[in-house]
């Protein structure tokens, strides 16, 4: 589950119309959400509040074995009046990353097209927001000693450019040593057709570059209204993206290079039934280390997702195989309330899961209508969950397992006014030399030689209360 201030930061990106999906850093975001989720390892309590549309706070306390905490503050120049902040109103799918259905590339708001027309400025007061250059400030103080201070500064420099400054400063371990500090500067550029990112870190003077290119029509070359070419245009059914990243540090002589491909279906772009469920394929290569990784993620139904990953190293011949799934659940009362909310919602007429209901044999209740080609991008899938009933999803169960039988299970849901995460990790654990000698003397050495046993790795619960 996302931290409350991370949720607010994503709301800031949505309010300022910044596309977080069009980035090489997000190439494998769906597989990472389904396979690389973390489970709580102890008891953790979070108290959060969006006290004003511009200011949010979070207080965190962790216990069991080690007592620590943090104090976080966030300020934004963009008013987040439409962002739900109470635990009973926040859509759970906004807090729990899962299968993310990205939309087709679109023109950033305020960016003129090739023919000189302005981009999409008809959504809310986007034009006024961009003129004020949206800014976000975020700072977190981690306690107890050694005290660590982290911060983030975001500023929208133009409709296509965003500046990010992140820093981390830790108190010196000894009075005579200097405190450790690092600053990471990022400049992100997004035109819809492609995106680029320039990075510099004061830690070892690291320079980096990331780029992503989307194959297909260029949203900057949209035809004018009334153009006959618009009559024959068809919405995109899939999207192929290619990207790469490179790093270099002249201080430590570190060089990094990777490249990747992503192919994903775009079911939200059309109402015609598909011959397959939404899926996402990725391929990433790291030539210097000889690593290759492929992922396949599938949205089997509106509430069930599956994902798998296979990694291989051509130098060491080591391999990795991971599989995972997630299941969303709703109580009967909330399901009835949500169905009524969908019928009353204008979004019900453009439901992007109609084709999935047909494939599963469910009644197709969404009225059909002809979608005309226009300059607006297809509606984003996560916007449906924002405008639907706040109780559209009461809980979610995530499970992942790898080839070594390391298993992680996570339950996240709503309990009264609290948002709760409970998880457990199981897997092989190394035995101590004393216990191994005892089991060997007793003739209890297992098939694996007694070098490891299978058991609990961690159990934890995290509780979030927000207002």
Swiss-Prot record:
It is found in: Mitochondrion outer membrane. The keyword Chaperone does not apply. It is a multi-pass membrane protein. Residues 361-393 are annotated as: Disordered. InterPro entries: Mdm10. Keywords: Membrane, Mitochondrion, Mitochondrion outer membrane, Transmembrane, Transmembrane beta strand. Lacks alpha-helical transmembrane segments, suggesting that it resides in the membrane via beta-sheet conformations similar to those predicted for other outer membrane proteins and porin. Belongs to the MDM10 family. This is Mitochondrial distribution and morphology protein 10. It comes from Ajellomyces capsulatus (strain NAm1 / WU24) (Darling's disease fungus).
